[in-house]
Amino acid sequence: MTNDEFIRIVNFVESKAGIHLAEKRSLVTGRLDNFLVRNEYSSYTDYMDQVEQDKSGKLTEELLNTLSTNHTYFMREKEHFDLFKNVVLPQIKEAKKREKDLRIWCGASSTGEEPYTLAMIIKDFFSLEGGAWDTKLLATDISTDVLRYAMKGE
C-alpha cells in the first residue's frame, strides 16, 4: 500500500464514519490485504475507485465493516455504568418525573453488550415504578455485521 493509497482510505473512512485511522497503518493494511485478494481487486487504488463510485453504498458498508473494531463485553467500563446508575439516572428521574419518558441512544453498540447492559440497569433502576416509565433504547453502530448479530440477541 502506497502512502497516497493509505491517506485516501483513511480520509474516506474518517469522512464517512468518523473513525480516525491515521496512526493505524498496520491495522488498515492487515485487514484489507486479504480482503482485496479474496475479492480480486488489482490494487488499493482500483478498490477505492470502485468504493467511491458505488452509488448503492454497499462497498462503503463493506469497507467500514472490515475496518471497524468491535471490542465489547457486558459491563465494559464498569465505572461508566456505575456513574450512569448512581448519578445520571437519578438526575433524569427527577428531571422527567412528570413525563416519565426516557430515550437513550447508544452509539458504537457493536454486538449489543453495552446496550443490553444499559437496558438491564434501566430495568433494575425503574423496577419499583411498576412499569410507569416509558423507556426506549436505540442501539446503533457503523458496522452492519455486528448490528445483525446484536439484533438476534444471542
Predicted regions and their residues:
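Conserved AdoMet
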Residues: 2-105
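Class I S-adenosyl-L-methionine-dependent methyltransferase module
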Residues: 97-154
